[in-house]
Amino acid sequence: MARSHAPAMCAVRPIKRIKVYSPNPANREAFAADMSAQLGIEVIALDSPDDAVSGTDIVCCCTNSFSHPVISGEAIEDGTFISNVLPMELGDDALARVDYTVKNQPLRALEHHVFSAGAPPADVTVRSEGAGWLRTVDDGTPLLSEVVAGKQRGRADRREVTFFSNNEGTGLQFAAVGKVILDSLEERGDVGVKTMPLEWFLQDMPD
C-alpha cells in the first residue's frame, strides 16, 4: 500500500520530501531508497512513527495492523491530512485531533470483521439497514464522492485536521488490473489460457 500511496500523492501534490517509518528497519530503508529513485525526491527512513508524523502535511497510514493504533494524537499538527488503510490504525487520541472526516462509502461489513487474538468485538452504535454481512450505515459522515461532486464541503481552513476514513474498500482496482491482464493476453493471442504466472499474484513482505 505504501508503495502505491507515495506515487499517488506525488501525482496530485507537489511533494518535496517523504518520511517513512516501519518497525522493520530493513524494510523502511529499502522503501526509502526505492521511492527516492522512483520519484526523484528525498525519502528518509525514521526510527519512530511520531517522528514521521510530526511536521508532516500528509500522513498516510499503510500498515497491516488489525488491533493497534500506529500513530499518536500528540504528533498530529494543525492542518494535517490523514488517510488510513485499516480502521484500527488511528486510536482515540488521534481521532480526537481530527476536525473533519470523510469516509469511503456507506457500506461496512458489520458481521464479517477480522479480529486478532484478544481484540474485543466491534461496538456498532450507528443506525443500519439491510441484512446479513453487508449493511448500509448512516452515521452522518460525508462520503468522498460527495466532496468530489461538490455536494459536501472540503477543508474549511488551513488549520483544520482532515481525515479520509477508508471504512471499506470497493475492490475496483482489482477489476482494473484484470482488464489490463485480459487486454495483454488478447494482444498475445493467449485468451483462453487458464495458467498465469504465479508471480503475478505474489508480493514481497510488507514494508
Model-derived segments and their meaning:
Residues I18-K19, I44, T162:
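A structural signal for isolated positions on well-ordered beta-strands in alpha/beta enzyme cores
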Residues A2-R3:
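N-terminal Rossmann-fold NAD(P) dinucleotide-binding loop
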Residues A94-P206:
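Adenosine-phosphate binding glycine-rich loop
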Residues A11-S36:
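NAD(P)-binding Rossmann-fold cofactor-contacting core
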Residues G40-S128:
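Rossmann-like adenosine-cofactor binding region
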Residues R17-Y21, S48, E77, V193-L198:
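Beta-strand segments within the central parallel beta-sheet cores of soluble alpha/beta enzyme folds
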Residues P23-A26, A30, S54, E77, ...:
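Conserved active-site and cofactor/substrate-binding residues in soluble primary-metabolism enzymes
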